[in-house]
A protein has these predicted regions:
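A solvent-exposed interaction/effector surface
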Residues: 1-150
Length: 150
């Protein structure tokens, strides 16, 4: 699949998340339980979901935040905390298709940035579009923060 990559400026988007330091080997087994914690909090009236599921990776450890886009600030409860997707310049693409193709989309952003002289930070995130029963119809927005020009 081809991934069109573009540079854009994002606006901050409030989120309700569980933050966790993990490993890349553990993360595929972990993210579902983290998201379940957030949804239990939202269903209990802790905040109002206004957007999609998100995964924010702050670095390569990875230190991750798994959660949902929400209306605004709220009081933390247990491991669910307020956070946000940052307002920043990013290189982004939309992956259309099954989630097992997300690595190719991330690789496409890296390749495009290398070709066009952009330097990436380690901060990146995925915004998962509306659920579709057909995996070929899934859409996931991938954004990588760009380093400030030297």
């Amino acid at each position: 699949m081809d991934h069109d990559v573009a540079v854009r400026t994002t606006v901050a988007s409030p989120t309700a998340v569980v933050a966790q330091a993990t490993t890349w080997q553990e993360f595929p087994r972990l993210w579902g339980s983290l998201l379940d914690e957030v949804y239990a909090f939202v269903r209990a009236g802790g905040t109002t979901q206004t957007g999609h599921n998100v995964m924010l990776y702050r670095d390569d450890v990875p230190n991750v935040e798994v959660g949902v886009q929400v209306a605004g600030p709220f009081a933390a409860s247990g491991r669910v905390i307020p956070s946000e997707l940052p307002a920043t310049r990013v290189a982004s693409t939309v992956h259309r298709g099954p989630y097992d193709g997300l690595t190719a989309a991330h690789d496409a952003v890296h390749a495009w940035c290398a070709e066009h002289g952009h330097v990436l930070t380690r901060t990146r995130w995925e915004i998962y579009g509306d659920w579709r029963e057909d995996p070929d119809e899934l859409e996931t927005e991938i954004s990588w923060e760009l380093a400030a020009p030297a």
